[in-house]
Amino acid sequence: MAAAAPATAAVRRMKLGSQGLEVSAQGLGCMGMSAFYGPPKPEPDMVALIHHAVAAGVTLLDTSDIYGPHTNELLLGKALQGGVRDKVELATKFGIAFEDGKRDVRGDPAYVRAACEGSLRRLGVDSIDLYYQHRVDKKVPIEVTIGELKKLVEEGKIKYIGLSEASASTIRRAHAVHPITAVQLEWSLWSRDVEEDIIPTCRELGIGIVAYSPLGRGFFSAGAKLVESLSDQDFRKHIPRFQQENLEKNAEIFERVNAMAARKGCTPSQLALAWVHHQGSDVCPIPGTTKIENLNQNIGALSVKLTPEEMAELESYASTDDVRGDRYPQAMANTTWQNSETPPLSSWKAQ
């Protein structure tokens, strides 16, 4: 494996969307520090990592109330003390609830407000910079959910509104109620189905694009070896792409990316991340990590330059036909953007 491109480049700033929010061109996804990717990591180490990121210029911090649940927001609350809050753009999310041991998606006004109050309390802040609906509630017209978020903006509790895993039509309906600043979606070398409809819709409406899992949930850092190292508590063990019947074919994609990275003098993860950065000045990837060394490597991806020919070559390695398996287990796939249409506003009876 090639040496990493150094993290010498300053992390540039970018406008996210067209409503006035400015962020670092690369953010930090904080989920894996507390949840889903194995046991929670030691809190002092994670606070140090967040502080290192902010000092390096990675100031968009991304969390959600479902990470833990709640523990990731509490971690960020500790990391933001001592003047750090003023140096960051803080993004969190609502909408996935665990009730009676079952996962539910909620976007009704009372829930939206209660969730926001809970996040403000855990984060120890009086305002959230970017507040996303994490998953779309298919029982509630999107106009109703956004209407409550609009009130929270007017009250100063949140500054900007975002959506995650929303279809193009849902984005349009939401944006008509209150301008949407950002849409968060999975976008990487091997997750490109958003390019057909959602990305053009965001660009037409002046909505910023936040790419989560830009490294394929770590796959583009280590390939098949990543899967061997996962603990039993790691939800990636259940992702179809990481199952044995799909892994052999998917590993070939990684090996091709790895070989190209060696030629470019960077790591495969830097190459995969650079590909996302090259999608446009309106795109902000938010790779997650729990190690300072990997964070520095991710920042180094900002200095990896790709020609149009190299972009096309990379894309040829991971065409839709080459990628085996879905990006989510079946139980979670029913809340992705492909399943995010909501009832018409005319059907809503206020509770």
UniProtKB/Swiss-Prot annotation:
Annotated keywords: NADP, Oxidoreductase
Root EC class: oxidoreductase
A GO term, aspect molecular function: aldo-keto reductase (NADPH) activity
UniProt keyword NADP present: yes
Record's GO cellular component terms: cytoplasm
Lineage of the organism: Eukaryota, Viridiplantae, Streptophyta, Embryophyta, Tracheophyta
Chain segments annotated as coiled-coil in the UniProt record: none
Region Disordered, residue ranges: 317-351
Species assigned in the record: Oryza sativa subsp. japonica
Regions of compositional bias (Polar residues) in chain numbering: 332-351
A Pfam entry, by short name: Aldo_ket_red
Keyword NADP: yes
Highest taxon, organism lineage: Eukaryota
Binding residue positions for NADP(+): 213-223
CDD domains given in the database record: AKR_AKR13D1
Listed EC numbers: 1.1.1.-
Designated name of the protein: Probable aldo-keto reductase 2
Active site: 67 (proton donor)
Residues bound to substrate: 134
InterPro entries: Aldo-Keto_reductase, NADP_OxRdtase_dom, NADP_OxRdtase_dom_sf
